[in-house]
Amino acid sequence: MFNCFFPDEYLDSTYVINFDDLYAQGYRGLLFDIDNTLVPHGAPADERACALFAHLKELGFKCCFLSNNQYERVSSFNDAIGVQFIENAHKPSTKNYIRAMELLGTDRSNTVFIGDQLFTDIYGCLLYTSDAADDLT
């Protein structure tokens, strides 16, 4: 019953993920939460985040921020990064996970979601990737 709140993998930081391996495994889309996933809550994009996204683009990943924050927060964070974004995403609703993948031209078989909150990020992603998700599209 509570499996929908457990991520497929747990790591201490986004910055320890081996994105080169993910790309080699065939993943092409990355969806990211922002606050407490990439930077502390409310912080601007820092050098580490900018370097990460430069590397991801170099690898060939398509990226999108999926955030429950308002436009001003997400847009200002993205100014230094330059990827697609969806603000006010209403996670855990699956609607904008689907929309983000449509923006990237990817699907659930080749997209990874990276977030920190169990009841919004993880739950929403697992709702979408469950077998029942086919009924939602």
Could you describe each region identified by the protein language model?
Residues 30-32, 37-45, 49-78:
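Substrate-recognition element of Asp-dependent hydrolases with the DxDx(T/V) motif
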Residues 94-119:
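Conserved Lys-Pro-Asp/Glu-containing loop-to-beta segment of HAD-superfamily phosphomonoesterases
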Residues 128-137:
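Single conserved hydrophobic/aromatic residue that forms the stacking wall/gate
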Residues 60-64, 85, 109-111:
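Short active-site oxyanion
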Residues 1-32:
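Non-catalytic pre-domain segments flanking phosphatase-related domains
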Residues 80-82:
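Short, structured coil segments at secondary-structure junctions
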Residues 88-94:
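Short, acidic/turn-prone active-site loops that include or flank metal/cofactor-
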